[in-house]
């Protein structure tokens, strides 16, 4: 591969970015176009180092039957990088809440850093993990090379360009004000193009498969890709004020805008953070423990029940609002129904270890994956419980919800991703094993303790917060002002930052471990604690 076409594409793309910066109708659009221009110029210069202008050397025809793993390698590295960045920004945001003087206006205040954190963790860390693992899994389970040639490269680089544009936009103050859908219209259009290419690559690989059976992991990955495309397009329907400006107006307003937003927001959780990562679970846990999926029939029931029910659950985010009561109740009912298929999937994941339970003790990667499934079960019980109106009246708008989200995002999505990265890295780079399994063990305990501290503190803080808000005296006046309720949360916010710092420390250990594995180093280690002793001849 001589990278000539890829280099030309980036060089040509820099030209319209330069024109956009020159003729922009507002300073924010001009600044964003300069960011795009310099990003494309730097990537062009980096690729120029690998371009070969020599004619191809005659030789035997190149075989294109091997798996296309180079893009998966880059996906793994991007996942690790964005994970560390996202967790670091999360710790900064947590400290800003505890110590407001750390807010640096205008670019690094809480209002701009918070969406940077959520997008970095969900879309940069989680999205790159999903793209990398889906490209790896679909090739192995279909026994076919990734479809589309260099289309896989376009998906990877195009998606990461979206991440850069979205992140810099947040710091500049460019936002639609829609949670998890903050990027403005032109960034949304770019993501749509990339996502269609992603769908074509993944679906094309399935259609050209040499394996007659389609793995259940691919069903979950495909549902995530298709549904996210639908959600993204509908929720981001907007009319730009100018094609050379950042501002746009949504196609929806009022309660319709709220319902569309949380139809998107909840199903981003349901399909981006659940269905896609279940694809990981159904492939990597059986591979790591060397056992088949416990019940393939249960996995199919899990899939179709999840697909049918999740899409209806969004209105539970809008209890006690202007949304019609029947819609709120509908969202609550489907949320409660979701508990059954979710726990069916959890049981299926855990029972896959049947006959290999000892690996929880001896293999820290398996331990990490099992902990992920346990957090999946906990989060999918807590979510339906919080959707019940009586419970929601206490939990809504409080830090309890923040604790719930992080127990799922860090415990489920984070842990299963870490396990997948530890599985993939030695295989992709042809190493015998990871640099250090003891470091994996350290990562596991730091991450687990960090999540437990974070979630438990937020549960307590949220309940205290809610009870202070609804405390009335005998005359019907509020006992506590809002400022008093905020001041009471200070020790909890410090503890939350500590939990986040522990989780970040684990991610830094992972980054070091993965880097050393890629470089080909191996740390000399004795048997890990808890490992079964080797058999000795009878005396």
From Swiss-Prot:
Main function: Cytochrome c oxidase is the component of the respiratory chain that catalyzes the reduction of oxygen to water. Subunits 1-3 form the functional core of the enzyme complex. Co I is the catalytic subunit of the enzyme. Electrons originating in cytochrome c or a quinol are transferred to the bimetallic center formed by a high-spin heme and copper B.
Catalytic reactions on record: 4 Fe(II)-[cytochrome c] + O2 + 8 H(+)(in) = 4 Fe(III)-[cytochrome c] + 2 H2O + 4 H(+)(out)
GO BP: any one term: electron transport coupled proton transport
Subcellular localization(s) per the UniProt record: Cell membrane
Residues that bind heme b 1; low-spin: 117, 406
Record carries keyword Metal-binding: yes
Record carries keyword Transmembrane helix: yes
Cofactor mode of binding and number, as noted: Binds 1 copper ion per subunit, denoted as copper B.
Transmembrane regions: 28-48, 75-95, 118-138, 154-174, 187-207, 214-234, 265-285, 298-318, 330-350, 368-388, 402-422, 443-463, 498-518
Stored InterPro entries: Cyt_c_oxase-like_su1_dom, Cyt_c_oxase-like_su1_sf, Cyt_C_Oxase_1, Cyt_c_Oxase_su1_BS, Cyt_c_oxidase_cbb3_su1
Top-rank lineage group of the source organism: Bacteria
One Pfam family matching this protein: COX1
Enzyme Commission code: 7.1.1.9
Cofactor(s) it depends on: Cu(2+); heme b
Keyword terms: Cell membrane, Copper, Electron transport, Heme, Iron, Membrane, Metal-binding, Respiratory chain, Translocase, Transmembrane, Transmembrane helix, Transport
Amino acids binding heme b 2; high-spin: 404
Gene Ontology MF: a single term: heme binding
UniProt-annotated binding residues for Cu cation: 266, 316-317
Protein name, UniProt field: Cytochrome c oxidase subunit 1 homolog
Pathways involved: Energy metabolism; oxidative phosphorylation
Mode of membrane association: Multi-pass membrane protein
One GO cellular component term noted in the UniProt record for this chain: plasma membrane
Annotated family: Belongs to the heme-copper respiratory oxidase family.
